Amino acid sequence: MKTDITLETWLGEQEADVKGSSLKTYKSYERVHIRPFLGHLYLAEITAKKQRAFKKQLCESLADKTVRDILSYLRTLLKRAKQKGYTVCIKTPKTAVEWREKEVPDFQEHKALSEKLRYSQKPVDMGILLAMSTGLRLGEVLGLRVKDVDLRASVLHVRANRQRIYDPKTNTYPVREQTPKTQKSCRSIPLHPALKNALAHYLKNMGNPDKEKPLIANRQGRAYDARTLQRRFQAVKKELGLRPGVTFHSLRHSFATRALELGASIHTLSELLGHSSVAFTLNTYGHSVTEQKRLEMEKIAKCF
């Protein structure tokens, strides 16, 4: 068995055969999380104990799904190494992690955000409002164009995803716009009255913009970078005194949680979020469904 190789070296030998957006994600996992914590170790030294410590560190600051994805990617890397004849520990820790409510804005935080942003005419504020009101991913918010807002039909069309994609030829992350990963990510979301009204005022303030213009654009008409919206969200979060664990992506979870609390079906929620399957939605938000069932049973109990 081969033993004289570190994870850092092994990562450098990998040839990615995945879509650009996924490649960007994997490279980010390597650079930000895997290399700093495990990269210096030989493959045989990455024991189950070391992996559990790695998982514990990830859980301190990342969303549950991100932790699962990073651990799953690490497991894939180790399995590939074993297939090549290297000595590795394949007893990786379970990828399931506990749901942490601290990551999701509660009702009062959600309401405070809405009241703060609803009447703002700043594009970055509209981007945040859209994320929390529709469950859109950050890249989907930035991929919206003026033509995607249909006020007559009260519908928002999601057709593109804008994000930085890793380019292995230049080792850079240029911003690119592409269609979403799956067909179900291309979707139409009904606009509730409050959001429709906010969008109508926002578009009016833009002054009859070109239909192809990015909806969330700067004064030069170019779409904002994701980091700009994230910085703005951090500023708003600090101003409103939201909990430290709340992130921009938490807005998507907040939308889903509020929807389930108000009686939305898991199937409808799955379509609104653009998930690949209802099973994935149930696996992600099953805790909220269980809590909703408990509340319904308490109502039924009053009949006995």
Segments (PLM) and residue ranges:
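Basic, Lys/Arg- and aromatic-enriched nucleic-acid-binding interface segment
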Residues: 64, 68, 83-144, 152, ...
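Conserved tyrosine-mediated DNA breakage-rejoining catalytic core shared by Y-recombinases
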Residues: 107, 143-201
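Active-site/catalytic core of tyrosine-dependent DNA strand-transfer enzymes
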Residues: 192-243
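N-terminal DNA-binding recognition helix of tyrosine site-specific recombinases/integrases
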Residues: 33, 41-56, 60-93, 137-139
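Catalytic-site neighborhood detector that most strongly recognizes the C-terminal catalytic loop/helix
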Residues: 5, 17, 162, 273-298
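DNA/chromatin major-groove-contacting recognition/catalytic segments
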Residues: 116, 168-172, 262, 283, ...
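N-terminal DNA-binding module of tyrosine recombinases/phage integrases
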Residues: 1-49, 202-207, 211, 290
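C-terminal catalytic core of tyrosine-transesterase DNA break-rejoin enzymes
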Residues: 65, 83, 129, 133-136, ...
